Every structure is written in C-alpha cells, then in structure tokens.
Amino acid sequence: MTVDVLIPVYKPDRRFARLIQMLKKQTVVPDRIIIMNTEKAYWNADGYRDIPGMEVHHLTKEEFDHGGTRNLAAWYSESDIMIFMTDDAVPQDEYLIENLLKGLDQKGPDGEAVAVAYARQLPAKDCRTIERYTRAFNYPDTPMVKTKKDVSTMGIKTYFASNVCCAYRKDIFRKLEGFVNSTIFNEDMIYAAAAMDAGYAVAYVPEAKVVHSHNLTPMQQFHRNFDLAVSQAEHPEVFADLKSEGEGIRLVK
C-alpha cells in the first residue's frame, strides 16, 4: 500500500517546517509529499530542497480553490491512500499516518467500507480558552464510524470531516469524482456526504492527532462563519434538510 501526503501551502511558517519534520519521523513514512504552493515568491526553495519524496507545484492566488486545488494534487498522486493536510497542522506524534490507515480499515455498522478517516485536532499551547472548548467539542476522544443512518440523530455533524488532516481511499475518491470545484469552503464535508450517499462510511480517529488551532479576531471569525454559511447555501442538496443549530452551529475547521 502506498501513501501520499498532499498539502496546500500559503506563506508557510515554522509550523509547516515542524509538520515536514514530523512526517519524516512517522512509523509509516509517506511515499511522496505533494505541495500545492500558492505564490512562488513565498516559497523557500533552499529550505526544502533535500526533503525525500517532496515535489512542489506552484500556483497563483487567483488559481487557488479549496476543492479544485486539492483535486489537482490528487491527480498528481499515484498512491493508494491520500492524506490531505493543511500547512499549519503538526502531527502530535509519529503514529499519525499509522492510525489514519487503521481508521480506513474499519467497517461501518452494516459492513460499509470507510472512504474517509479524519484526525483529532488538539489546541496549540497559545490557544485561547474558547478555542480549546471548541476543539474539545468537535474533536472528542471517542472514535466514531458514521454512515447515512446517523443523520436523524447527529444532523449536520454526520457529514463532519476536516481536510486539516484527513485520509482518503484513492479508488473511492476517483469513483466519486473527487471534491467539488469552485467551493468557498466545506469541500471535505460535501465529499463526506457524497461518500455516505454512495454507501460508504466516514471514520473519526482520535488516536490520529495533529496540533491545530486558531486565535481568530472577532472579524476573522465572522468571515469564517460567513464562508461556512455561503458554502452550505451553495449546496442545498447536502445541507438544506439538515439541522445546523445546536451542536452543528459550533463546527470549526
């Protein structure tokens, strides 16, 4: 089985450097690290020139799209398993990839194959209190394997998955034609919904952990919530009949 890690990057900082170092220490080392870098001027070519298996593809800010850019990265990948990450998500330990693969090997309650397995997000040391509570709410320590049948009890959270750190089976990804293009947000949840509609399951794997949190200003949080609402409105086939109040309203990527 082959594994690629695919990372959209924009103005990478020390967290990205730490992410790459932790990928090199994994018990299951990725075959390739595919970087989709927005704006070549921000890329430190000398700093990452000698990373085994790393390849970098540059695009402009105007070309970036949450779904489309990840689809292009998937097209470059030839692996059995693709792990999408963001450039500020740092593996907590050396077992991240190993545990995500175990998550993909699980089955749903009726024997459904798992198409998607996403990791637990832990707050960084400088994370504010409200963000810590949100992380604990959305990423508990209890594993889950979700299917379409859970919509009646879980509402919108049935489809929750996060490309901050998320593993996909390449054969199913191709069968479902990947992510939606030209989406402002939520390409991961829209894909999870499509996978469940096709009879697959989505696994939450708390043993797979990344450090990832934000200290957003009120205005930044407003824009984030606005983008979330727009993406839901643009895809009524997924979100129209789902409850988004209560626990769902607190979703944070």
Language-model features: locations:
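Conserved donor NDP-sugar-binding/catalytic core segment of glycosyltransferases
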Residues: 95-132
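Glycine-rich, basic loop-to-helix element that forms the pyrophosphate-binding segment
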Residues: 60-77
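Active-site-adjacent helix/loop segment of glycosyltransferases
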Residues: 202, 208-253
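A recurrent flexible, glycine/aromatic-enriched loop bordering the glycosyltransferase active site
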Residues: 148-168, 184
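Short aromatic/hydrophobic "clamp" motif used to bind/position activated sugar donors
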Residues: 82
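Short, well-formed alpha-helical segments that are part of the catalytic scaffolds
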Residues: 12-25
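Acidic donor-binding loop at a coil-to-helix junction in glycosyltransferase catalytic cores
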Residues: 184-191
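Short beta-strand/loop segment that forms part of the nucleotide-sugar
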Residues: 30-40, 57-59
